């Protein structure tokens, strides 16, 4: 056989297995039985003339040929998707999907913005994935989505990152915390105050730790959580203070559960970024959504509504 005889179906199957590094998970995603999936991968390997995976114990690994084919598959499938979208655009159609992956912190405004976009473009089927930074970076590396919303673009990846909204970080405490009565608090004053933080690798935590380290302060971490809600509940319960995006605490400020501390150097001025792999040809739908993000954030109607620290 020759690689020219490989089918698009086989390439899609191989790409799924390479993405998950698991035949079982790929079969589940594609709604195929594992035996049927294995047959297609074996036939593709025969067409290539090289094994695509090595199996060591229960784990599989890409061979050199598999690595090369993975890169080719991404290019082929991306080009095909882009072609499909271009044809739809030329025909004046708004069909197909828009896949957006965003941080859990943005759940306070990105769904609202996506809803506004869908109202203007009812023919676009949108898929929203919400996760933490580590998961989003994994998805970005695999090019699983059309667009990624991040508070801090990855420095180790070749990406395009366009800022579309402010994302100030503030120090937050329970309303009756003694420090809420003070002004212009020196960062060093917080050296012995217990902090409730997001999980290691979180963009918010990275920014907070970097700031305090620059001021000679190593944060005293009492607890860490993978969600803003858990962090806020712990702070409201008096277990410590935290650093969060201002967009996440509007309700708690209004209800009197939490307060922003006046710490020197805060708020930390950050941005929200629309991110995609460099070299990727973004679809007309992705481009339209990015334009909507910029416009909505500029006029403040659907963008992140931020409290004043």
From Swiss-Prot:
The keyword Acyltransferase is annotated on this UniProt entry: no
Annotated keywords: Activator, DNA-binding, Transcription, Transcription regulation
Gene3D superfamilies: 3.40.190.290, Winged helix-like DNA-binding domain superfamily/Winged helix DNA-binding domain
Transcription among keywords: yes
InterPro entries per UniProt: LysR_subst-bd, Tscrpt_reg_HTH_LysR, WH-like_DNA-bd_sf, WH_DNA-bd_sf
One Pfam family recorded for the sequence: LysR_substrate
GO MF term list: DNA-binding transcription factor activity; transcription cis-regulatory region binding
Domain HTH lysR-type: 6-63
DNA-binding feature ranges: 23-42
Family statement drawn from the similarity comment of this UniProt entry: Belongs to the LysR transcriptional regulatory family.
Function: Trans-acting transcriptional regulator of RuBisCO genes (rbcL1S1) expression.
Matching PANTHER family: HTH-TYPE TRANSCRIPTIONAL ACTIVATOR CMPR, HTH-TYPE TRANSCRIPTIONAL REGULATOR
Protein name: RuBisCO operon transcriptional regulator
Organism listed in the record: Acidithiobacillus ferrooxidans (Thiobacillus ferrooxidans)
């Amino acid at each position: 056989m020759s690689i020219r005889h490989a089918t698009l179906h086989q390439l899609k199957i191989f790409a799924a297995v390479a993405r998950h590094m698991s035949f079982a998970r790929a079969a589940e995603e594609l709604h195929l039985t594992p035996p049927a999936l294995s047959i297609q991968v074996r036939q593709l390997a025969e067409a290539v003339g090289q094994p695509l995976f090595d199996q060591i114990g229960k784990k599989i690994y890409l061979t050199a040929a598999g690595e090369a084919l993975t890169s080719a598959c991404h290019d082929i499938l991306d080009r095909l998707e882009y072609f499909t979208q271009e044809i739809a655009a030329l025909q004046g159609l708004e069909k197909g999907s828009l896949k957006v992956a965003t941080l859990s912190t943005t759940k306070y405004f990105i769904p609202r913005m996506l809803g506004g976009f869908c109202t203007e473009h009812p023919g676009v089927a949108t898929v929203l994935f919400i996760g933490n930074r580590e998961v989003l970076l994994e998805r970005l590396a695999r090019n699983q989505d059309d667009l990624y919303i991040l508070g801090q673009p990855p420095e180790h990846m070749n990406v395009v990152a366009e800022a579309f909204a402010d994302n100030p970080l503030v120090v937050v405490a329970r309303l009756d915390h003694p420090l809420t009565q003070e002004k212009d608090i020196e960062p060093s004053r917080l050296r012995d105050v217990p902090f409730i933080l997001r999980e290691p690798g979180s963009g918010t935590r990275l920014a907070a730790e970097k700031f305090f380290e620059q001021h000679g302060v190593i944060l005293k971490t009492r607890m860490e959580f993978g969600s803003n809600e858990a962090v806020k509940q712990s702070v409201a319960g008096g277990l410590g203070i935290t650093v969060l995006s201002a967009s996440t605490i509007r309700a708690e400020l209004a209800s009197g559960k939490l307060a922003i501390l006046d710490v020197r150097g805060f708020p930390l001025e950050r941005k929200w970024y629309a991110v995609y792999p460099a070299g990727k040809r973004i679809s007309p739908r992705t481009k339209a959504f990015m334009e909507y993000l910029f416009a909505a954030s500029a006029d403040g109607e659907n963008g992140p509504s931020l409290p004043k620290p």
